[in-house]
């Protein structure tokens, strides 16, 4: 696992800028007490942090961070870390949300960006209409934010939040009263468009009106 300085600087700047649009808190997660590459990350990020005095900057070792994200997830705003640790923490965070099917992701390059669900493809669910589409939909919202289409992105976030509040979910989150992938997509689309929706009963004895 090796990095060039410019690579760490680029992602560090992106993380600090993201923090400035949130709670202005950033935590660097590494293993600087053991790994040379983590010491390199910490040295580089410490210098970048000087350019963002308005952001509250902290550091945690990965083992402590893995514990804290379960015990007190709200303490974190933006986490900056290397790919190895990020893969671990993102899967761990899915336990808090209830499903990997809720987690979007983005890979931001200098010229190109990629937005996709954290879980990647789901070949086991092909043709079964059972996948949770929320992660993909939220990935689209992140893409809109990248294009500075903030209102459009917020409309998506609001629609998804509404579904979660009303327990309109796929089977991975609500096995007793669940909606299919296509139903979820249609509902979220209608909410974004501001349409009045009546949800048909998906299972006997269940019905919802938004």
What is the meaning of each model-derived region?
Residues 1-12, 34-42, 73, 86, ...:
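Generic structural signal for well-ordered, non-membrane alpha-helical segments
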Residues 135-210:
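Mobile late-domain/C-terminal helix-loop "cap" segments
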Residues 1-63:
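Glycine-rich phosphate/diphosphate-binding loop of Rossmann-like nucleotide-binding domains
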Residues 70-168:
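Glycine-rich phosphate/nucleotide-binding loop
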Residues 16-23, 30, 45-53, 73, ...:
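Structural signal for hydrophobic packing residues in well-ordered secondary-structure cores
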Residues 39, 67, 90:
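Active-site glycine- and acidic-residue-rich loops that bind
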Residues 57-76:
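A structured beta-alpha segment of the ubiquitous adenosine-cofactor-binding alpha/beta core
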């Amino acid at each position: 696992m090796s990095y060039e300085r410019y690579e760490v600087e680029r992602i560090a700047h992106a993380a600090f800028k993201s923090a400035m649009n949130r709670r202005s808190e950033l935590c660097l997660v590494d293993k600087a007490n053991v790994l040379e590459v983590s010491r390199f990350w910490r040295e580089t990020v410490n210098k970048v942090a000087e350019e963002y005095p308005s952001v509250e900057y902290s550091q945690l070792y990965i083992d402590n961070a893995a514990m804290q994200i379960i015990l007190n997830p709200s303490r974190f705003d933006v986490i900056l870390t290397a790919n190895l640790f990020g893969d671990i923490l993102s899967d761990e965070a899915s336990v808090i949300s209830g499903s990997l099917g809720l987690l979007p992701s983005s890979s931001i390059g200098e010229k190109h960006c990629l937005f996709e669900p954290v879980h990647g493809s789901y070949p086991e669910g092909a043709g079964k209409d059972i996948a949770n589409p929320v992660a993909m939909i939220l990935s689209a919202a992140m893409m809109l934010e990248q294009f500075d289409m903030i209102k459009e992105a917020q409309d998506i976030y609001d629609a998804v939040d509404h579904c979660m509040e009303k327990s309109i979910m796929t089977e991975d989150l609500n096995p007793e009263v669940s909606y299919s992938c296509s139903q979820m997509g249609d509902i979220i689309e209608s909410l974004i468009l501001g349409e009045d929706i009546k949800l048909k009963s998906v299972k006997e004895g269940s019905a919802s009106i938004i």
